[in-house]
Amino acid sequence: MAKEHYERTKPHVNIGTIGHVDHGKTTLTAAITKVLSEKGLAKASDYADIDAAPEEKERGITINTAHVEYETEKRHYAHIDAPGHADYVKNMITGAAQMDGAILVVAATDGPMPQTREHILLAHQVGVDYIVVFLNKTDLVDDDELVDLVEMEVRELLSEYDFPGDDVPVLRGSALKALEGDAEQEKVIMDLMDTIDEYIPTPERSTDKPFLMPVEDVFTITGRGTVASGRIDRGEIKVGDEVEIVGLKEDVTKTTVTGIEMFRKTLDVGEAGDNIGALLRGVNREDVVRGQVLAAPGSIQTHKKFKGEVYILSKDEGGRHTPFFSNYRPQFYFHTTDVTGVIELPDNVEMVMPGDNVTFTVELIEPVAIEKGTKFTVREGGHTVGAGVVSEIDD
């Protein structure tokens, strides 16, 4: 008998659990898979499986992350849960797992704690725009007014970081009780999933976004012209499309794609994820260099100054052994090339220690095609010493 073909009929959304240590993120993740598995929508993962997250390397940084997947009636979800606080910080900054939305878990017994605040700040900085709150362990609080107070605090904290604190959905329950099979708490988990279905919008598909391809290599085909090759980051490109060559120079060059090749075969359309070569009309070999991008006209500009949210590797991770101060000049690796930049630390930060995460301003010596959300690594002598994401354009 022929195997059943997997139909990707439901829209796909990436989410994750965030919040303070021991507030119940992993227990909630396990409870979601258990409750949905009883409806045939997931494979139940127990706490120990999720907690023993495998190590992954993303841009030279080791991160522990657990991935589970499940479905609701409406959608397919990939859900990430990281065991340690440092893993969360690294995960959100490197974008190892891009989240479309997050479930903020706050124990009603404790209320918001330091990492609650830090995870909300990080979510804001790296562009996770939608948060649903789960007030956990409410079975351990006798007084409902105390839970109301915690909810109010969480809403205020979200508003402080530009989330719509008054409108964010807040659910109350006990992840542990749901995991143990308490019918009332299992219903709360289903309500949570319904809320996530409704509140967190389906992300725009990568192929629907404006075309962007970082240039990795440039070569000439005699008699035909100049080819720029690389992996398409987002969007799609068709033969005959106009593109701009952006970055590393003040001027933007406009050109038309007259041919697309992949694996030595010609293509009509290249899309996000494809490694292609694009033949560019009327462009000289020296007009395109590695580190520039090909982009849909008007979709991205060059900038020299930006704010970045950055994780600095610890000594054990192969990072620096000593702190750095303002005016530190490392290389910033954007897309496919290194550009030197000068770091300016915020007024309240005297120095940055290996293992810290920090927001700082960078002024690059050459203009680079970047926007809010562009990922980069910080390098020194060819070694990665940090990873970051552009949180704001400053020039």
Swiss-Prot record:
Gene3D superfamilies: P-loop containing nucleotide triphosphate hydrolases, Translation factors. Keywords: Cytoplasm, Elongation factor, GTP-binding, Hydrolase, Magnesium, Metal-binding, Nucleotide-binding, Protein biosynthesis. It is found in: Cytoplasm. It catalyses: GTP + H2O = GDP + phosphate + H(+). Residues 19-26 are annotated as: G1. The keyword Transmembrane does not apply. Signal peptide: none annotated. One of its GO terms (cellular component) is cytosol. InterPro entries: EF-Tu_GTP-bd (IPR041709), EF-Tu_GTPase (IPR050055), EFTu-like_2 (IPR004161), EFTU_2 (IPR033720), G_TR_CS (IPR031157), P-loop_NTPase (IPR027417), Small_GTP-bd (IPR005225), T_Tr_GTP-bd_dom (IPR000795). Residues 136-139 are annotated as: G4. Mg(2+) binds at T26. Residues 10-204 form the tr-type G domain. Residues 81-84 are annotated as: G3. Residues 174-176 are annotated as: G5. Its EC number is 3.6.5.3. The keyword Nucleotide-binding applies. GO terms for molecular function: GTP binding; GTPase activity; translation elongation factor activity. GTP hydrolase that promotes the GTP-dependent binding of aminoacyl-tRNA to the A-site of ribosomes during protein biosynthesis. Monomer. This is Elongation factor Tu. The gene is tuf.
